Amino acid sequence: MILTRRQSLAGLAGGALLGTLGAPAIVRAQKKPQIGIVVKIGGIPWFNAMEVGIKKAAEEQGVDAWMVGPTQADAAQQVRAVEDLIARKVDVIGVVPNDATALEPVFQRAQAAGIKVVTHESPDQKYNDWDFELTTAQGYGDAHMELFAKLMGGEGKYIVYVGSLTVPLHNLWADFAIKEQKEKWPNMQLVADRFGVAESMDDSYRTALDQLRAHPDLKGILTFGSQGPIGAARALEERGKEKSVVLVGGFSPGQGVKYVKDGTIRGGFIWNPMVAGEVFVRLSTNLTKGQTPTDGMEIADVGPVHVDPAKRLILAQKLESLDKENIDRLVTMGL
């Protein structure tokens, strides 16, 4: 069964599909389901694109869904945002966590209040109902390292950025990438512990400058976090290192297109944050109807969905290449 944007992500577990995830809601007299989605930080292109998907799916579903964007990538701000949504008595709270552990107590309070909790980019999250991912952790980490190692010629010194040292998924991507490097490209050398700066363009910029000074022979920067490539690219161009240092990572295409076209960012991979926003709303809407995802379903434009009920995890694998051949198409899509 193929699920379009107007069809269900999942049927009822072990039974017939009683509703559809993505189908327009029938207008009823009762209050529309309320869905609040808290992202890592507001005002950056990645989450702006996610908000477009949230709004689109909300209209499609006939629900009230909105995005809450903290002013900083700060765990305490996310906790306060979730507390506010609990006080509003919403039906579902969605979160892209900055710090999975810091959110556990407030997620417990949400569930105690009868509110469903859905996360993204936090596959081992506690006290949520479901987490969904549009790539597998190993697939994402390995894809980046394979490209990175090829461009570095399989040798040389490199550093790694993640969005934060407390974002589990970013660190899992880095773990898989580094493991892949050690197994396949032993002549590459990680010269520092990973840096938790890639949700801030300014921090990524400053860290790149610092590491270029500390390691004049640095040959590569691999970054997981959408602002990492942008900040590092600024630093490389400022220091005249854009040709000698390989820069690879995921970012919002509209923000990084200039650096791809001039060769400073050599490539990377992303999933579509607009689709992630849509899935947030569709999954949440189905949960308000008592429906549960089932293994083997497909999402249009994403592909097959693997559902692991024991881990409360929904997995797909759909990556877009951030290279000169594909970047304009992604920018045209509004990413």
Regions flagged by a language model, labelled:
Residues 7-27:
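N-terminal export signals
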Residues 8-10, 28-335:
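A residue-level marker of the well-folded mature domains of exported/periplasmic proteins
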